A protein has these predicted regions:
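Loop/turn elements at helix/coil->beta-strand transitions in domains of secreted/extracellular proteins
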Residues: 10-14, 37-42, 61, 189-192
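Active-site-adjacent beta->alpha loops and helix N-cap segments on the catalytic face
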Residues: 21-33
Length: 222
C-alpha cells in the first residue's frame, strides 16, 4: 500500500507487475491497492499468467502476459502469436491478452542493439496478427532509430483501427489448410477483419468463403 501511495503521488498510470507475482492472492492485493485510489492505472501482469486462472486475470487485470519473453525470430514470434485462441472468451474492453511486445526495428538489450531478424513479410505477419488479437501494441524498439519501414508498420492507421475497435473482440482461428491459417475478428460496425497467414517456409495458396468467415451477401473487400 505504501508503494502504491507513492506511485499515485508521482502520477503513475501504468503498472507492469513483473516476474511472476501472478498468483491470484498477490494479484488481488495489488488490484485492490490500486483501486483504492481515485486514479486510472493500467494494471499489467507479467509474465506467463497461468491459464487455469484466466477468469481471475480477466477480473483483476487490464492485460496479462500469456507467454514468456518474445525473441525477434520467426520461430519465437509465430509460436507465441499463433497460440492465443483459447484466451478469446476472457478478452474484452479493458481486459486484454499480451503475447509480449512488438519486435520490429532496432531491438535488443543495452547499447548494442540490432535490427530485427524478422524478414519484412514476417514483420507484416507480426503486426497484423497482434492487431487481430486485440493485444496491446507495445513498441519494443529504439524509437530514436526508427527507419521508414518500421515507422510505416507502427503507424498504419487501418491496422491500428482494427486493433482498437471498440467492440474489443479477439480474433480467433476459423480455418486451417495445411500451413495456411485464417483468423477473423468481428468489428463494431458489423464488418469482419480477416487475416490469412502462411506459417510455412514456401509459397502456398489459401481460400475462404463468406460462410466460413460468418458473413453473407455482397461485401466490400478492402
Amino acid at each position: 500500500k505504501n508503494d502504491v501511495r507513492q506511485w499515485m503521488e508521482w502520477g503513475m498510470d501504468y503498472l507492469k507487475y513483473d516476474w511472476n507475482p501472478n498468483d491470484v492472492y498477490h494479484v488481488t492485493e495489488m488490484h485492490d491497492a490500486l483501486r483504492s485510489h481515485n486514479r486510472d492505472v493500467v494494471f499489467s501482469l507479467s509474465n506467463s499468467a497461468p491459464w487455469g486462472d484466466a477468469i481471475q486475470w480477466e477480473r483483476l487485470a487490464n492485460c496479462w502476459r500469456t507467454t514468456g519473453d518474445i525473441k525477434d525470430t520467426w520461430e519465437s514470434m509465430s509460436r507465441l502469436g499463433f497460440n492465443q485462441t483459447k484466451w478469446a472468451p476472457f478478452v474484452g474492453p479493458g481486459h486484454w491478452i499480451d503475447p509480449d511486445m512488438l519486435v520490429v526495428g532496432m531491438v535488443g538489450w543495452g547499447p548494442k542493439l540490432h535490427y530485427t531478424r524478422l524478414t519484412p513479410d514476417e514483420q507484416y505477419t507480426h503486426i497484423s496478427l497482434w492487431a487481430l488479437l486485440s493485444s496491446p501494441l507495445l513498441i519494443g524498439c529504439d524509437m530514436a532509430q526508427l527507419d521508414d519501414f518500421t515507422l510505416s508498420l507502427l503507424t498504419n492507421d487501418e491496422v491500428i483501427e482494427v486493433n482498437q475497435d471498440p467492440m474489443g473482440k479477439q480474433g480467433i482461428v476459423i480455418a486451417e489448410q495445411g500451413n495456411i491459417v485464417t483468423y477473423a475478428k468481428p468489428l463494431e460496425d458489423g464488418s469482419m477483419a480477416v487475416g490469412l497467414f502462411n506459417r510455412g517456409n514456401t509459397m502456398a495458396k489459401g481460400t475462404l468463403t463468406w460462410k466460413s468467415v460468418g458473413i453473407r451477401g455482397e461485401q466490400t473487400v478492402r
